[in-house]
Amino acid sequence: QAGHQLDFFTGDARMLRDRIARVLPDWSSSVPGYHAVLGMYAFGLEESGDYLHGERVGREAVSLQPDDAWAQHAVAHVLEMQGRREEGIAWMRGNPAWQQDSMLAVHNWWHLALHYLEHEDFETVLALYDGPIDGHQGSLAMELIDASSLLWRLQLRGVDVGNRWTGVAERWAAMANDGRYAFNDFHAAMAFACSGRTDLLDGLSEAQRRACQQ
């Protein structure tokens, strides 16, 4: 699992699939944790473009362990990539087990919101944002990424998001000078720019310059 996460953060789609594929023959449904291996394999297949196989494996993992949020997430990716919006909503709504006690819960709610966004059901998207996505005002970077990217998508579609950017920017502020991970910084920059916090945006840009020179 640690290797799978490393492959994810380095963007190595081939190894996301193949690292798990190599050990899969040594696993079976009689071995505890088999569902987790299938969930990782499903995500690797999806990221490699093998949507049919990825969906099948992901659904099998969830059937074995309904609260496997990573397997749920892998199938959500497939349905999103294929534009299967109604099926995506049904998939996420039909299994409430992923919503409980998981660091991935907010991100999975975000995936559900994307399906509603494609339907231009902005009222539901904003309700999801104000509820399970950002209602708890979380400060984890992975949750702030989801908040920023969803507000950005809404704004690009001309939706008035009110003052929601302000709170997101305030929570990103503690990480503005880190300059450690460009993906995070880009999402922080969205919040700073859209909330008018040019001071934080300047600090973020300077942190990026320092990091690039190291």
Located regions from the model:
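Long all-alpha helical scaffold domains
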Residues: Y51, Q65-A76, R84-H111, L126
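Helix-coil-helix junctions within alpha-helical repeat/solenoid scaffolds
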Residues: L114-Q214
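Non-membrane alpha-helical segments in proteins
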Residues: Q1-F9, G39-M40
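Canonical positions in the second alpha-helix
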Residues: V23, W27, E60-A61, G94-N95, ...
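Hydrophobic secondary-structure block in the mid-to-C-terminal portion of proteins
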Residues: D26-P66
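Generic helix N-cap/helix-start motif at coil->alpha-helix transitions
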Residues: Q1, S30-L38, P66-H73, D101-W109, ...
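Helix-turn-helix repeat elements of alpha-solenoid scaffolds
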Residues: D7-R22, F43-E55, H77-R93, H119-Y129, ...
